[in-house]
Amino acid sequence: MKNRILVLTLASIVGFISCGKDKELVEVTIPEPEKVEKAAMGNPADVKAEDEEGAFQMKGLPYAYNGLEPFIDAKTMETHYSKHHVGYCNKLNTAVKGTDLESKTIEEILKKLDMSKADIRNNAGGYYNHNFFFDILTANGGEATDEVLEAINKDFGSYDEFKKQFSDSATKLFGSGWVWLVKDKTGKLVISTTINQDNPL
């Protein structure tokens, strides 16, 4: 008990002594917060592959970065198109340059992919997946065709049930990846998932 009182007393004395040293205090002025300027969005048409002669190029977007709002915000679209997608395009061009893959379509590359070649697997997948993603979205939304709706109703019971299962698959996907609606070998519509930049091809 005496030791505890002694320690507390010493701590108090040190605290009082350090508080009494006014000559060591320095007055500072805290600046007012700066206004943060909102970054201007670029134009998707300005995004080009580094190698203009490369086998793969940027296809362009049929809408502005903010064209899918409120469902997908402009910053997300700009990041995916002008950073991720062009990055996959540039790295894919580098990976296939001077190889027999340089003359192949992206679909041909993916269908006969050597899964051990990570640079081609990731960048070809990222290039294809993002092209597909951007192509199927429309600025004003859209409706499924009668043929697609009929197939969805046949294989999932209803469009609402399909949306629920599709959303559930996306929610359960751990990390980055994709959710796909595809036909299996029997022609039945099924929902599948792939990790990272893999795809059903």
Model segments located where?
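Feature for soluble, non-membrane regions of globular proteins
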Residues: R4, G20-L201
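Sec-dependent N-terminal signal peptides
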Residues: I5-I13
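C-terminal motif of bacterial Sec signal peptides marking the signal peptidase cleavage site
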Residues: G15-S18
